[in-house]
């Protein structure tokens, strides 16, 4: 029988579950972590906490299940939306992630509405500018932490940071990307109009995949650490 793993990078914990091909839970593990609140209305987390939680729980479910590594065929990712993860040229995290419930970006939302009418935002991204979404967070960092923005080479969502940790691939999938306010939702691709309007370089963003598409396989060092095979696939969502 073949098996699959699902990883949910949540706000309070990461949970990893091993299923058989009929959907029966074989083993599960979770690891909690905290939130940073530097000011009222701000909410951040350390991406390194997610990374450690994922690697630990992957190892745990593999060990607890006793399932041969070769029988585990794929990994699916889900997680908290809208969070901003910024990596430098060495793929190191630049600053804590500004997560979905952070409300500091009211000024950036107003700026976005001045740049483009509300109706056009809805036409392109299926939503008006919102404080919790990623685009406003990017603008906040550009304005208040220009030195961090200048160092940034990759912008990722939380589960896509985990994808990069596991596979080395910079990618996202349509359901999560739709919450960044940068996606042409109907076209299912990054909106060149939005990126130009906000002066965000397309090269900072990963490729967009459908949720069921294969985005990569495990890096050898990750496979060794978790007890999985390096040919284990990781899908978009």
Predicted feature locations:
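N-terminal glycine/serine-rich phosphate-binding loop of ATP-dependent small-molecule kinases
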Residues: 1-95, 123, 151, 206-207, ...
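Gly/Ser/Thr-rich active-site cleft segment
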Residues: 9-11, 121-237
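Conserved donor sugar-nucleotide recognition element shared by glycan-biosynthetic enzymes
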Residues: 47-50, 54, 105, 134, ...
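Residues that scaffold the ATP/ADP-binding catalytic core of kinase and kinase-like folds
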Residues: 96, 108, 165
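Carbohydrate-associated surface elements
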Residues: 102
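Hinge/lid segment of periplasmic solute-binding proteins
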Residues: 106-117
């Amino acid at each position: 029988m073949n098996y699959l793993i699902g990883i949910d990078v949540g706000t309070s914990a990461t949970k990893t579950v091993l299923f058989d091909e009929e959907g029966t839970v074989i083993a599960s593990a979770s690891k909690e972590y905290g939130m940073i609140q530097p000011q009222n209305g701000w909410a951040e987390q350390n991406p390194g906490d997610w990374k450690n939680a994922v690697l630990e729980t992957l190892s745990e479910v593999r060990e607890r299940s006793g399932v041969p590594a070769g029988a585990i065929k794929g990994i699916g990712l889900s997680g908290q939306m809208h969070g901003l993860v910024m990596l430098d040229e060495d793929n190191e995290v630049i600053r804590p992630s500004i997560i979905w419930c952070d409300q500091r970006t009211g000024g950036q939302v107003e700026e976005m509405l001045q740049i483009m009418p509300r109706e056009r935002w809805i036409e392109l991204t299926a939503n008006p500018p919102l404080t919790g979404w990623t685009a406003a967070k990017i603008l906040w960092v550009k304005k208040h932490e220009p030195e961090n923005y200048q160092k940034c080479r990759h912008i990722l969502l939380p589960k896509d940071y985990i994808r990069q940790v596991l596979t080395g691939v910079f990618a996202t999938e349509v359901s999560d990307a739709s919450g960044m306010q940068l996606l042409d939702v109907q076209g299912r691709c990054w909106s060149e109009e939005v990126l130009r309007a906000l002066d965000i370089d397309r090269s900072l963003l990963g490729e967009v995949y459908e949720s069921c598409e294969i985005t990569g396989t495990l890096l050898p060092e990750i496979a060794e650490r978790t007890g999985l095979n390096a040919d284990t696939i990781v899908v978009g969502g």
